[in-house]
């Protein structure tokens, strides 16, 4: 079914590819291995002329617990194929971290957003922090009725996740409240705000997603591609890209501030005790 380490790839319907994050023991937390597996799987679907729609899912029990703070078991960026144009990953201080995080978080997510085929995220259970980035990269989000969306990164002394789409997804005032409080958005509230397209019973999530994918796949491919580009470019023309570049730079400023104060890139007060030592060990590595 899959030759990837952390994701599954299949074609459940004609013209539909499904990419499933598959680290259930880690709650589908995203490490570098998963990032590059996802990229390879997205490329595979994008370059397959028979595929017209791509579905992104997460193995139960939940969609994504966000970034894996435990890292990659000793592996570094050298063990994975660099996709973008960032460089100097080994540089000291902010330079190296900026390059690494730009590659594996912001730029690669933007790359997925701009795949020239419709993409649908099927979200069940929790979708936290880095998991939001994965869902936001998709054109449509279908949520199970138990889906919960949260970005707790402010509690860790950082101004939201690296792919800072919050104002574009839920509106400016709600984005401020959501981040300031680190509250959870339920599926129905997320739908009312426009971040989620549909809410369905959990037991019917994949059936509903595949039915939607099949309906979209019946449309002309070039019309789907150009419509997606037109809508994405409309959003970009309103300043989305510039705003996200600025937010990413501020995110890195927060990391540098925390490194000076605490010796790690986040405020340890926002980390569970069980995570602090692992985070320290990962960052030292």
Q: What is each model feature region?
A:
Residues 110-224:
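Crotonase-fold acyl-CoA enzyme core
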Residues 35-37, 70-74, 160:
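Glycine-rich, phosphate-binding/catalytic loops in enzymes
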Residues 33-37, 104, 111, 208, ...:
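Charged catalytic carboxylate motif
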């Amino acid at each position: 079914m899959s030759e990837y380490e952390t994701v599954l790839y299949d074609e459940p319907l004609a013209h539909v590819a499904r990419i499933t994050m598959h680290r259930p023991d880690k709650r589908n937390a995203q490490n570098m291995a998963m990032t590059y597996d996802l990229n390879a799987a997205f490329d595979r679907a994008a370059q397959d002329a028979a595929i017209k729609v791509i579905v992104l899912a997460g193995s139960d029990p939940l969609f994504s617990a966000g970034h894996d703070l435990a890292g990659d078991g000793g592996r570094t960026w050298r063990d994975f194929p660099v996709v973008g144009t960032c460089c100097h990953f080994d540089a000291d201080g902010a330079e190296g971290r900026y390059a690494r995080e730009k590659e594996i978080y912001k730029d690669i997510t933007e790359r997925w957003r701009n795949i020239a085929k419709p993409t649908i995220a099927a979200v069940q259970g929790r979708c936290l922090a880095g998991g939001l980035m994965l869902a936001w990269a998709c054109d449509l989000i279908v949520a199970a009725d138990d889906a919960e969306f949260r970005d707790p990164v402010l509690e860790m002394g950082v101004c939201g996740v690296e792919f800072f789409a919050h104002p574009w997804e839920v509106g400016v005032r709600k984005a401020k409240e959501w981040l300031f409080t680190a509250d959870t958005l339920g599926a129905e509230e997320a739908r009312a705000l426009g971040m989620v397209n549909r809410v369905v019973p959990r037991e019917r999530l994949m059936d509903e997603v595949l039915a939607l994918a099949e309906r979209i796949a019946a449309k002309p491919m070039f019309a789907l591609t150009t419509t997606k580009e037109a809508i994405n470019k409309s959003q970009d023309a309103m300043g989305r890209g510039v705003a996200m570049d600025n937010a990413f730079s501020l995110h890195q400023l927060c990391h540098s501030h925390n490194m000076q104060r605490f010796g790690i890139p986040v405020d340890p007060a926002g980390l569970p005790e069980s995570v602090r030592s692992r985070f320290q060990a990962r960052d030292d590595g």
